[in-house]
Amino acid sequence: VTQADVGSALANLKIPGVGSLSQSTICRFESLTLSHNNMIALKPILQAWLEEAEGAQREKMNKPELFNGGEKKRKRTSIAAPEKRSLEAYFAVQPRPSSEKIAAIAEKLDLKKNVV
């Protein structure tokens, strides 16, 4: 989460008299370069944001996923040497095969079409 994200998220807390804060204000709070009075004023606001953010993260971790959506990172595909040589030979002959040809190559090599 960036400092700008924190500043923007503060507006979502709906604390009376508190809007969003600039990235530079958050930076100065972190580096302890704000005045003492400003630090005292901002601490409960930032504490409220932190508690809400941590609560949302805990809830997200405890909630079972109905489906594994966009956050799951795809693993890197590794192709064995024989399949790699076959693919290189196919693409040397035809650098831009049609979708049907790619599907046929994938089936022949027992690979997924999106891997080919």
Curated annotation (Swiss-Prot):
Residue range(s) of DNA binding per entry: 72-116
Region named Disordered: 56-79
Main localization category: nucleus
Keyword Nucleus: yes
Cleavable signal peptide: none
Residue intervals of the POU-specific domain: 1-54
Cellular localization per UniProt: Nucleus; Cytoplasm
Keyword Transcription regulation: yes
GO biological process, one term: positive regulation of transcription regulatory region DNA binding
GO molecular function, one term: DNA-binding transcription factor activity
UniProt keyword terms in alphabetical order: Cytoplasm, Developmental protein, DNA-binding, Homeobox, Nucleus, Transcription, Transcription regulation
Annotated GO CC locations: cytoplasm; nucleus
Functional summary from the UniProt entry: Multifunctional transcription factor with different regions mediating its different effects. Acts by binding (via its C-terminal domain) to sequences related to the consensus octamer motif 5'-ATGCAAAT-3' in the regulatory regions of its target genes. Regulates the expression of specific genes involved in differentiation and survival within a subset of neuronal lineages. It has been shown that activation of some of these genes requires its N-terminal domain, maybe through a neuronal-specific cofactor.
UniProt cross-references to PANTHER family, sorted A to Z: POU DOMAIN (PTHR11636), POU DOMAIN, CLASS 4, TRANSCRIPTION FACTOR 1 (PTHR11636:SF42)
Family stated for the protein in its record: Belongs to the POU transcription factor family. Class-4 subfamily.
This protein's name: POU domain, class 4, transcription factor 1
UniProt organism field: Gallus gallus (Chicken)
Gene: POU4F1
